[in-house]
Amino acid sequence: MRYGFTTGSCAAAASKAAAYMLLTGKRKTEITIETPKGIPYTAQLVDIVRSEKEVSCAVEKDGGDDPDITTGTLIYAKVSCVDCAMEAKQGHPQIVIDGGIGVGRVTKPGLDQPVGNAAINHVPREMIEKEVLQICSLVDYKGSLRVEISVPEGEGLAEHTFNPRLGIVGGISILGTSGIVEPMSNQAILDTIKVELNQRKAQ
């Protein structure tokens, strides 16, 4: 059976590509990242929109042979300069990550992210930051960048997930610990049960 890639991997790939196009001025049609599992992921880029201060692009989620409702969904990343002309005060790039349309927002304690944050879990956040910093290093950019992840179909898809029950409103979560989706794995259900138990403990 064919494995797929998580929403976190898609978000990281789109973020890396958007950062590359913004900071180099060159167009990309595909990008490769390394997943936490060590398996490389080469993503095709679609719906590329470029301007001087921001670039957005999308990656189509491929769940492999896993019956995942997000398969075929476009995961977008928009990368913009906070101030392209200035270096960050710390002397190294600062990456700010947030969720846009179709990415859920946390409203209850006990989840991976604090209340008020976008439901982009810590491993995808680390993946996004790592890939974007790699591009910053490539071009010796030391300023600040804002990364916004969005999923236009996310709000509708979220109705078919555990998110409403967990207090995540407005969209899906950006998930993944290994970066890949193993076909017919029970891990996602076990992870959701664990999250719900942690949440009850926090209340």
Q: Can you say where each PLM-predicted feature lies in the sequence?
A:
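Generic N-terminal targeting/processing segments that precede catalytic cores or assembly contacts
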Residues: 1-166
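Glycine-rich anion/phosphate-binding loop at the beta-strand->alpha-helix junction
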Residues: 152, 156-159, 163-203
